[in-house]
UniProtKB/Swiss-Prot annotation:
ATP binds at residues 64, 105, 520, 557. Part of the phosphoribosylformylglycinamidine synthase complex involved in the purines biosynthetic pathway. Catalyzes the ATP-dependent conversion of formylglycinamide ribonucleotide (FGAR) and glutamine to yield formylglycinamidine ribonucleotide (FGAM) and glutamate. The FGAM synthase complex is composed of three subunits. PurQ produces an ammonia molecule by converting glutamine to glutamate. PurL transfers the ammonia molecule to FGAR to form FGAM in an ATP-dependent manner. This is Phosphoribosylformylglycinamidine synthase subunit PurL. It is an enzyme of class 6 (ligase). It comes from Thermoplasma volcanium (strain ATCC 51530 / DSM 4299 / JCM 9571 / NBRC 15438 / GSS1). Pathway: Purine metabolism; IMP biosynthesis via de novo pathway; 5-amino-1-(5-phospho-D-ribosyl)imidazole from N(2)-formyl-N(1)-(5-phospho-D-ribosyl)glycinamide: step 1/2. Keywords: ATP-binding, Cytoplasm, Ligase, Magnesium, Metal-binding, Nucleotide-binding, Purine biosynthesis. Its EC number is 6.3.5.3.
Length: 759
């Protein structure tokens, strides 16, 4: 059947709700009433393709209807003089140097990864790459921040085993990313049982483009031709955005059908083809066919340019020849790009597509006016006002701020810190990520200067940020870091988000760069609940306040709601991807100790608070009070560490696992031990000083020959000399009493193999 009419004008409220459920539209009663009223005004009943197109455009995933009000309120006007495009197209664009710009974006692929972990994660990588490519940029780096369930437990109330999800997600990222030739260089992995049924897969991509080759995601002029380039169109991914805009309840045939099928062997030539065409200057506009498929891509692109479109689906190459018109229109089949060219350039674009063995279809024409018409087999299946399609309802949802009591629960001190330390380094959230990251190719393209690990051969440790050299003839580099602190945000959404951003800044600064831009992926539960909406609003407010304070542009973002299962929400998880600039990549710093007899300094005021720390959580303490980070102190750290970089041999921020894990990881990268005394850090208990994770602290390794200059120049900051490097043991004392004395290798062995049983 090509199409059928739906008699919506005669439907009552119950009929409208039943129709929304029956067709998988995920529209509310009020939204269905608005659709009914539109067609009453038009004097006709809709065709099925029109109803599905509206549902796609009005989905939470595509329209941001629950978040747009607050995003505009708090994140507008966060541009800088070096911002080229922010919150306008498929990705953000920021100046790199006088001739080039870098392009960046982060997206979530959460619901698909919960139902089909391998495929969901793989298509998340493919989609984020196309978001960057459609701006005309060559992808140069992939990023993925993963939030997984409790893989250590065999008991779970979830759709799938958390361990199965974890292994599938990593496998999907590995197989897609490695096959398209883009290095996977940065990210994070965090574990908590709240993610058992709702894993979070936040994928990011960075690209590089000449400024005169930036492509917009909005139509250029009437008369241009719309083309479809890439893979074939099938039934995979139908209603994908509707599925991602609702609460996950069970795995069904419809939910599996909503998962897109990725094919990196098509993605790579598609990427090469459109970049080749862009280099020739024939692409006037371009948009990735991701969520919502052709329906969303075509509607959004022509509407953004102030035009309409006349489209025919007859030339589209199909996987299933019996597909109906509405299925073709909303299919979310992957590896497809909507391209706009001048009429005289159609044949040239076709030649390029055929050269790369890609499917090529002529869709139609950009026209004056605000109407979109779509035909299939000589039948008109869509004839609608684009403004109605693209202007989904915007909700100012009510919210309640969390009432945070200023109380802190203090866990008891370990009886034996040596035994405790050996167990602590092997915990899921402290252990090495080698088992995950070594599956990814992080050196392809030959531009990775500092990878996700750094250190001496066979003694690598975690990097704070990675460093990419995008251009062959320039030493200027990009620094990349990504992650979230849901353990903090769940206690205090505002201060916890500030802590997430503070850590990102310290990661960039520790590696030798200066923060330059921000993108986010905001993952929360059901926005129809006021407490969840309160988490979201406070988190977005924090991002706005922080970025204004530090003059950082927020250039792109993504919101993922409805991450709940059986009324259990995930921890609020605002993931931040931050990019920094370094003028000379040869000056980049790494995290591992470089030599014996170096002086170890702690920079920044101690937070002295265990709330949200891994130490507290392993003692089953999940509440508390989180002090706001001192942002003025952080600004001074950026200035001083950047200005006096030659004094610093290595640096590592204090975050997950506290001061203890920061020092241990610095030791793990070279095998060089250390001897420190906690007495000068603060007056708090030893466990608080060792395992507190909040605040702005950074550990610095200082060459003794520069120590005098260092202390003089850093006198405006809180700095404490806590010890020196040397030997092959980790020795921690306090006021002359020994607390920890262990071989570096013994601790490293536990840390390195912490994930072995799970992946």
């Amino acid at each position: 059947m090509i199409y059928r009419h739906i008699k919506i004008r005669d439907m009552n409220d119950d009929d409208l709700i039943n129709m929304s459920k029956r067709h998988g539209l995920s529209l509310s009663l009020d939204e269905m009433k608005a659709v009914r009223d539109y067609f009453i005004k038009e004097g006709r009943d809709p065709i099925d393709a029109e109803i599905h197109a509206i549902a796609q455009s009005w989905s939470e995933h595509c329209s941001y209807k629950s978040s747009k009000f607050y995003l505009k309120k708090y994140l507008t006007n966060l541009k800088t003089d070096y911002t080229i495009l922010a919150m306008e197209d498929d990705a953000g664009v920021v100046e790199f140097d006088k001739d080039y710009a870098y392009v960046l974006k982060m997206e979530s692929h959460n619901h698909p990864s919960a139902v089909e972990p391998y495929g969901g994660a793989a298509t998340g990588i493919g989609g984020i790459v196309r978001d960057v490519v459609c701006m005309g940029a060559q992808p140069i780096a992939l990023v993925d921040s993963l939030f997984m369930g409790d893989v250590a437990s065999q008991k779970y109330d979830a759709l799938l085993s958390p361990r199965y999800i974890f292994q599938g997600v990593v496998g999907g990222i590995r197989d897609y990313g490695n096959r398209i030739g883009v290095p996977n260089v940065a990210g994070s992995v965090y574990f908590d049982q709240s993610y058992n049924s709702n894993p979070l897969v936040n994928a990011g991509c960075i690209g590089i483009v000449r400024k005169d080759r930036i492509v917009r995601s909005k139509s250029y002029k009437a008369g241009d031709k719309l083309l479809l380039v890439g893979g074939k169109t099938g039934r995979d991914g139908i209603h994908g955005v509707n599925f991602a805009s609702a609460t996950l309840t069970r795995i069904s045939k419809s939910s599996r059908n909503a998962i897109q099928l990725g094919n990196p062997i098509v993605e790579h030539p598609m990427m090469r083809a459109v970049l080749e065409a862009n280099e020739l200057g024939i692409i006037k506009a371009m948009k990735d066919l991701g969520g919502g498929g052709l329906s969303s891509a075509a509607t959004e692109m022509v509407f953004a340019g102030g035009f309409g479109a006349e489209i025919s689906l007859d030339d589209i190459k199909l996987k299933d020849t019996d597909m109906s018109g509405w299925e073709i229109w909303i299919s979310e089949s992957q590896e497809r790009m909507l391209v706009e060219v001048l009429p005289e350039d159609v044949e040239k674009m076709k030649e390029i597509a055929e050269k790369w063995s890609l499917d090529f279809s002529i869709l139609g024409t950009v026209v004056e006016g605000k109407k979109i018409t779509v035909r299939y087999k000589n039948k008109k299946i869509i004839d609608m006002d684009i403004e109605f399609l693209d202007k989904a309802p915007v909700y100012q949802r009510p919210f309640e701020r969390k009432n945070i009591e200023k109380k802190v629960s203090i866990p008891s001190e370990p009886e034996d810190l040596n035994d405790f330390a050996l167990n602590f380094v092997s915990r899921l959230n402290n252990s090495a990520r080698f088992n995950v990251v070594r599956q990814y190719d992080h050196t392809v393209r030959g531009s990775t200067i500092v990878g996700p690990f750094s250190g001496r051969p066979n003694l690598e440790t975690h990097s704070d940020a990675t460093v990419i050299k995008p251009l062959e003839d320039s030493m200027r580099g990009l620094l990349i870091t990504s992650g979230s602190r849901p353990n903090f945000v769940s206690i205090d959404p505002y201060n916890g988000t500030l802590e997430t951003l503070s850590e990102a800044v310290r990661n960039i600064v520790s590696t030798g760069g200066k923060p330059n831009s921000v993108v986010d992926a905001l993952n929360f539960g059901n926005p129809e609940r006021q407490d969840i909406m309160g988490q979201f609003v406070e988190s977005v407010r924090a991002i706005g306040d922080f970025c204004r304070k530090f003059s950082l542009p927020v250039v792109a973002g993504n919101v993922s709601f409805y991450n709940e299962f059986r009324n259990k929400d995930i921890m609020p998880t605002p993931t931040i991807m931050m990019v920094g600039i370094i003028d000379d990549v040869t000056k980049a710093r790494t995290t591992y100790f470089k030599k014996n007899k170096s002086q170890i300094y702690l920079v920044g005021t101690p937070c002295d608070n265990l709330s949200g720390s891994e130490y507290a959580r392993m003692n089953n303490i999940f509440d508390g009070f989180l002090p706001a980070p001192n942002l003025s102190e952080l600004q001074l750290e950026i200035e001083k560490i950047g200005k006096f970089s030659p004094y610093i041999l290595s640096a590592h921020d204090v975050s997950d696992g506290g001061l203890f894990m920061a020092l241990a990881e610095m030791s793990f990268g070279s095998g060089i031990g250390f001897n420190i005394d906690l007495g000068n850090v603060s007056a708090s208990r030893s466990s608080v000083k060792l395992f507190s994770e909040c605040g702005n602290q950074i550990v610095l390794e200082i060459d003794p020959i520069h120590e005098e200059e260092f202390t003089a120049e850093f006198k405006d900051l809180k700095i404490v000399r806590i010890g020196e490097t040397g030997g092959d043991r980790i020795i921690i004392d306090e006021y002359g009493m020994n607390l920890v004395d262990l071989p570096v290798q013994d601790l490293r062995e536990r840390w390195e193999h912490g994930l072995d049983a799970y992946i």
